[in-house]
Each structure stands twice: as structure tokens, then as C-alpha cells.
């Protein structure tokens, strides 16, 4: 079975996305986005689901970047789902594949 990591920064305005992953046995990261630890978690999973608010340059936790171009080399090796505003721009700019929103 593939190991799935969910990165969904805590934000009550995106709680409606929780049914996508809750109760499925996925590893969930909703707080504590230290870059080195997050990269290690990504490396140890086959699939990465990224949810929340974002912009052209990646996924945000309020105004702080959580996923940005420094993660691209790791993400290219994974099955990806990106659900945030402008996820398509981020995926396209970095040659990432997978399901993503516009």
C-alpha cells in the first residue's frame, strides 16, 4: 500500500477539505512546517496531498510559505495532488505532474 502524506495547514476556512483525507490512515501535517522535517516526511512517502491556501509560488500557512520551489526536486518523485488557488501555476512552472486545481 502506498504511503500518503497530507500537508494541510490548519485554517478554519479550508476545513471543508478534511473529508478528502480524514480517517484514511494517511500521515497528516497540519502544523509545525519546519523545512527539513517536512522534506524528510515527503521523502518517506509515495504520494503527497497538499491542501489549503496558496499562490503562484506554492502552498501557504497564512502568509508563510510551506511548500515552495525548494521542495520541487522531492515532489517530482512523488504522486501529487495540489488543491490551492494557483496550484496549476506552481505545477506548470516546475514541471510537476498530478492532479491540481487552477
For each predicted feature, which ranges?
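Catalytic cores of nucleophile-dependent amide-cleaving enzymes
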Residues: 47-102
Amino acid at each position: 500500500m502506498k504511503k500518503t502524506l497530507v500537508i494541510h495547514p490548519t485554517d478554519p476556512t479550508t476545513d471543508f477539505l478534511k473529508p478528502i483525507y480524514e480517517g484514511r490512515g494517511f500521515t497528516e501535517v497540519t502544523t509545525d512546517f519546519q523545512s527539513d522535517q517536512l522534506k524528510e516526511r515527503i521523502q518517506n512517502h509515495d504520494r503527497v496531498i497538499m491542501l489549503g491556501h496558496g499562490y503562484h509560488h506554492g502552498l501557504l500557512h497564512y502568509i508563510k510559505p510551506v511548500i515552495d520551489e525548494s521542495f520541487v526536486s522531492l515532489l517530482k518523485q512523488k504522486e501529487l495532488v495540489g488543491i490551492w488557488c494557483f496550484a496549476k501555476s506552481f505545477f506548470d512552472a516546475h514541471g510537476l505532474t498530478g492532479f491540481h486545481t487552477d
